[in-house]
Amino acid sequence: RPELVLPFVLDKNAAKAALKKYYRGKRFLPNAFSSQNHIEEIKGVYVPFWLFDANASGSGQYEATTSSSHRNGDYVITTTKHYDVRRAGTTQFMGVPVDGSTKMPNGHMDAIEPYDYRAFQPFSTAYLPGYMADKYDEDADTCQARAHSRMQNSVSSELSASITGYNSVSTLSENISIDYTAKHYALLPVWMLHTKWQGKEWADWQAGRRSAS
């Protein structure tokens, strides 16, 4: 049973209007995507997600360089200096989302983030009428691997981004530790429209993003 639900705020008419706006001006878009009858088939689905909280710490060693050039007669002299740079830091993650349904392409679900978690409500079946609702088929342990990768990449990016003032920076080593503090099973709202065209399945997700699978 889900712990939390993020109720639909965008109703079907608003979702259709957003989709039409996204399609507007795309002169070569096949009619299979934009016909009124097809857009009417848009569906609201509560997608199962696992949300992970964690404390993370990371440290890294980097090689940085600066270069300067000056002319000496007919020659251009370039001087490159190398620096040993160390960085370390800590951060906290709250509610890193990973969809728990194999029917939902992970890349598509990532693309429609972020969600406004301030609108979360304790789960109640009263929010479900009028919408489809999936149950997870990937458990928290399976999904935690994706959350772990996302957190590691985020910490690595923040460490690297803190190194400024050099012409180049290369990573020599990094050590990142993630300590999970909580996980939550939640239902998040997604508007979906599937289209078959030229033998491929296409999907529009909530804010009018389209991709092929």
Regions found by a protein language model. Give the residues of each.
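Juxtamembrane amphipathic/hinge helix adjacent to a transmembrane helix
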Residues: 197-213
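Charged, low-complexity helical/coil segments in non-catalytic cytosolic or luminal regions
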Residues: 2-200
